[in-house]
Regions:
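Conserved class I S-adenosyl-L-methionine
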Residues: 2-13
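The conserved SAM/SAH-binding core of class I Rossmann-like methyltransferase domains
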Residues: 7, 19, 146
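A short SAM/SAH-binding and catalytic strip from SAM-dependent methyltransferases
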Residues: 45-60
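Conserved Rossmann-like nucleotide-binding pocket used by diverse enzymes
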Residues: 17, 29, 48, 79-82
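Active-site regions of enzymes building and remodeling cell-envelope glycoconjugates
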Residues: 15-35
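A short acidic, Gly/Pro-enriched loop at the edge of an enzyme's catalytic core
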Residues: 31-48
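S-adenosyl-L-methionine-dependent methyltransferase catalytic module, highlighting the catalytic core
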Residues: 59-68, 74, 78-179
């Protein structure tokens, strides 16, 4: 059976190993998603992370995380990632005629994090253009936007006022390394 890694997961599911910064009964590996040194190169067929990347700083940590995730993916492996879509959240936040101040406050929390524990702070806002650039720099190809991943009951499927607020993407580690001339 091919190994699959769920980074930041909170729901146990057969066939998936969960890595999280905080221990719990569902967690297989406690650790930081920036350092997957416990795993060999190319050992996972899939890596899934929902609402994780926005917790890293955009200058150093986000590129390092994607490089690590790329490293542990097998050639031809898929990264399934979900982030709060800054474009959608910003648009909704500006709809003063639709949302009252309390509803807009909840939208603001989706942008900056809920601040419910030490890891619940968002350090970067992401949209499809930003994600495409980060994923390309990390060596991923074949970027696809998907409506939903339908793997876990998680924040990737959050809907506000009938609008999905997550940017759900699939990207692939090339099956063969590019030949440089």
């Amino acid at each position: 059976m091919q190994r699959r890694l769920h980074i930041g997961g909170h729901e146990a599911k057969t066939g998936w190993e969960i890595l999280d910064a905080r221990p719990g009964p569902h967690v297989d590996h406690v650790g930081n998603a920036l350092d997957l040194g416990r795993f060999e190169d190319g050992c996972f067929a899939e890596v899934y992370a929902s609402h994780v990347l926005e917790h890293f700083d955009y200058a150093d940590e986000l590129p390092r995380a994607l490089a690590e995730w790329h490293r542990v993916l097998a050639p031809g492996g898929v990264l399934r990632v979900s982030v709060p879509d800054l474009d959608i959240l910003a648009h909704l936040l500006l709809q003063r005629h639709v949302f009252d101040v309390n509803q807009r406050f909840q939208l603001m929390r989706m942008i900056f994090g809920g601040h419910t524990h030490e890891h619940d702070h968002h350090r970067v806002g992401l949209n499809q253009d930003f994600m495409a650039a980060y994923l390309d720099r990390a060596g991923f190809t074949g970027l696809q936007r998907v409506t939903r991943h339908a793997l876990f009951s998680d924040t990737s499927e959050t809907v506000v006022a009938g609008t999905p607020i997550s940017l759900n993407l699939n990207a692939y580690k090339p099956a063969m390394a590019a030949v440089r001339s």
